[in-house]
Amino acid sequence: MEFSSPSREECPKPLSRVSIMAGSLTGLLLLQAVSWASGARPCIPKSFGYSSVVCVCNATYCDSFDPPTFPALGTFSRYESTRSGRRMELSMGPIQANHTGTGLLLTLQPEQKFQKVKGFGGAMTDAAALNILALSPPAQNLLLKSYFSEEGIGYNIIRVPMASCDFSIRTYTYADTPDDFQLHNFSLPEEDTKLKIPLIHRALQLAQRPVSLLASPWTSPTWLKTNGAVNGKGSLKGQPGDIYHQTWARYFVKFLDAYAEHKLQFWAVTAENEPSAGLLSGYPFQCLGFTPEHQRDFIARDLGPTLANSTHHNVRLLMLDDQRLLLPHWAKVVLTDPEAAKYVHGIAVHWYLDFLAPAKATLGETHRLFPNTMLFASEACVGSKFWEQSVRLGSWDRGMQYSHSIITNLLYHVVGWTDWNLALNPEGGPNWVRNFVDSPIIVDITKDTFYKQPMFYHLGHFSKFIPEGSQRVGLVASQKNDLDAVALMHPDGSAVVVVLNRSSKDVPLTIKDPAVGFLETISPGYSIHTYLWRRQ
């Protein structure tokens, strides 16, 4: 994750809505607020004493949005979220023919084309499913709508752990019968058949966009491992190409077969969740160790051919699925081997050590070396570090960490960004090793209530407005500034710009689109905005 020292984790602060709103109003004379349309519902805010608020949802009410609004040519839509409590509030303004502003100018460069976006989403862990299903059915539906429907933030990616992970309440794999090398006893437990699979189907039914499923394994069955345990330092027995590696590769196909029987098809699998974890003595939860050389040979001799020769040959294979600190070295080892490289579609990265790994030296260099291998951010959450509180209800800082990471990733060729647990309880679990963390949605089953945190809306500023197939384009600033910004073009040619202000200062701002003119606006302190406009 982007580095946040203990001092940056905010202490409880009183909300200062009036001052922020006043500051933003002075610079927004051209913008006209749009009243909540018939389908949209405003946030019911609640403060838990941190820097911002959560939005409260229950069985009968949850804030919602209309589908993204593209106004007539010559005007723009602006969606605003602020620390003071605004949540993706819509306003509109005219696009000016001439530049009258004196502040920062951001110029769109549509001829500079970069990566096409796959999408945004989160993980349907056992813990997430348990929390969602602990709500009453009407509240469950409102939570799923919040993530996946047009009146929510339009997620189009769901990551699915293959069997248990730390966010499970027990340890299991799909083939726990010892020495079952033919996997005759492979079966999905109730965590899949009663929890995850029904919820994934409900999410797909609610989604207006096609949703892509991504699977990741944490551990193999223990009888395939050198240490005979789900956790701790251990890897597959034997060598790539042998019965242990072949069995583990066929386990992937059996998983895809089993989900296909439940009418679920996967877009991609990762070769292993955090393969470096299983190289560490005493690692506390499910893992399976691979060095880059071991992963290279496993992909080349076992996993790649096994997938390619199965009915799931269209399922993409992503390597690494670990900290970007391991790049570009890990990519060099795997992708300079033509036998491994031919099976690898992309490189998945996690955010937890990003503060040690500058994006340019890792993502940027990897893209330079392997421009045809896509980069995909597959996991992120806050609250996992020893100095961090697990859950901070209403933390604006944590929302900013998310959006800063997303913008940074987009600027360095990453095609998608996936959050970790879709929902957790107020403790940040359940988690069988008590590795509690935060989540964009926190479920309080005692009140049949769930809380949508600032992280949820920060993610929504991207997921709702950047559909699959959108392409990042150039955006150049006229001077040094404290804003984070990224520009993209929708498949239909319309434009979207996301601007994040992590500072306390309001920043007058003009966005120039050579095709249509100038968008005069302001970026208030501690705010995030998404701008949309038609170009033809």
Curated annotation (Swiss-Prot):
What's its catalytic activity?
Answer: a beta-D-glucosyl-(1<->1')-N-acylsphing-4-enine + H2O = an N-acylsphing-4-enine + D-glucose; a beta-D-galactosyl-(1<->1')-N-acylsphing-4-enine + H2O = an N-acylsphing-4-enine + D-galactose; cholesteryl 3-beta-D-glucoside + H2O = cholesterol + D-glucose; a beta-D-glucosyl-(1<->1')-N-acylsphing-4-enine + cholesterol = cholesteryl 3-beta-D-glucoside + an N-acylsphing-4-enine
Name the reported effect of S405R. In GD1; loss of glucosylceramide catabolic process
**What happens upon changing C43S?**
Loss of glucosylceramidase activity
Outcome of G234E? Answer: In GD1; severely decreased glucosylceramidase activity
Result of altering C381G = In GD2; loss of glucosylceramidase activity
Result of altering S235P: In GD1 and GD2
Q: Does the keyword Hydrolase apply?
A: yes
Mutagenesis or variant effect for E274K: In GD2; loss of glucosylceramide catabolic process
The outcome of changing L303I is: In GD; decreased glucosylceramidase activity; 5% of normal activity
Q: What does altering G429R do?
A: In GD; decreased glucosylceramidase activity; 17% of normal activity
Q: What's the effect of swapping P161L?
A: In GD; decreased glucosylceramidase activity; 16% of normal activity
For this UniProt entry, what's an example GO CC term? extracellular exosome
- Mutation effect (R502P): In GD; loss of glucosylceramidase activity; increases susceptibility to proteolytic degradation
Question: What residue range is the signal peptide?
Answer: 1-39
GO biological process terms, alphabetically, are: antigen processing and presentation; autophagosome organization; autophagy; beta-glucoside catabolic process; brain morphogenesis; cell maturation; cellular response to starvation; cellular response to tumor necrosis factor
**Result of changing D419H:** In GD; decreased glucosylceramidase activity; 4% of normal activity
Family assignment? Belongs to the glycosyl hydrolase 30 family.
Q: What is this protein called?
A: Lysosomal acid glucosylceramidase
- Species this chain originates from: Homo sapiens (Human)
Corresponding gene?
GBA1
